[in-house]
């Protein structure tokens, strides 16, 4: 392995161990008996005391100093940010930008389960970071800087509301309603929620491809493929969280395997079609790794705990652990509450939308021309086990979503004409 002599001045390599600070602490879950039996493994073979050692670069070791949170949880957050960064942007040429991306992911992880600590409408200073400074460290001098800064602030706005008491506000109610409006609108909102196009742009920045940017149509296809693949694999994880933002809460769930297969086919075809464009390797790598392999390689997921399987139906134990933020997950349980705080919503739309909402989001939120047969609520979250937390759409809408899913190859060719020949190969 190699030694990073300097993480701040670039990479200098020598033939010794990698200098990464690690901590060995958090005891994690023991595999469930039913999983062990289904896998054909005797209980005596199961690892009864799995301990994670959290590895991450020393650049992050002094972050979150002023945050009121257990040290072990901070270490897990740092390791999660490092692992995610390494998985979705495996190649890089610019270490300072790479570290900036890790810090952006750290802020996002906290927003996902401790939203009360993040309020992007209150200013740039949060958890010891200045958001503008961190975003500029990643995107300053790149072709899509302004849009990506808005994209990230939009992510923080909604994500922090979802995991805090602000979830019962008018903003989040309108947001969840808008998710179910149409499949194309869904994928644009899921794109922002997953930081999909944001990470594609970050991959370009971390490889010093400052002048390269994608059209909105190209982003739509790349992110739809990635989100479809990820959500198909994460189906039971999302249900255990009572998630509002999962593709197969709205797409027909019985088409999940078909949707994954089709998206994977289009991705491999795209990989062939774009192979001569070496500058796009990192983009395809992001979609590929985000679409499934991270569920095995990142300790944020339950691959080891569920004895090297993916897609186990969530149990009461898993749901209870999710409520306790095990693996930094977060549970959205339904609350008997009526949406309120309309003033905050109106203030954000009127005064801050150009900074904290991606282009088009205001129009999504303001349009309340909803299907009369779908089940919309005043407040969102899972009402029972094995249930998502968002709008329950009607059978006619599900059929429309299914048709949209099947049109992916045709829409992909319109965005990337190079695909036409590859997809036509019998």
From Swiss-Prot:
Highest taxon listed in the record's lineage: Eukaryota
Keyword Cell membrane carried by entry: no
Keywords: Lyase, Virulence
Keyword hit for Lyase: yes
Enzyme superclass (EC): lyase
Coiled coil ranges: none
Signal peptide interval: none
Pathway stated in the Swiss-Prot or TrEMBL entry: Hormone biosynthesis
Induction: Expression is induced during the early biotrophic stage of development. Expression is positively regulated by the ABA cluster-specific transcription regulator abl7.
Documented EC number(s): 4.2.3.-
A single GO molecular function term of this UniProt record: lyase activity
Function text: Alpha-ionylideneethane synthase; part of the gene cluster that mediates the biosynthesis of abscisic acid (ABA), a phytohormone that acts antagonistically toward salicylic acid (SA), jasmonic acid (JA) and ethylene (ETH) signaling, to impede plant defense responses. The first step of the pathway catalyzes the reaction from farnesyl diphosphate to alpha-ionylideneethane performed by the alpha-ionylideneethane synthase abl3 via a three-step reaction mechanism involving 2 neutral intermediates, beta-farnesene and allofarnesene.
Similarity comment: family membership: Belongs to the alpha-ionylideneethane synthase family.
UniProt-recorded name of the protein: Alpha-ionylideneethane synthase abl3
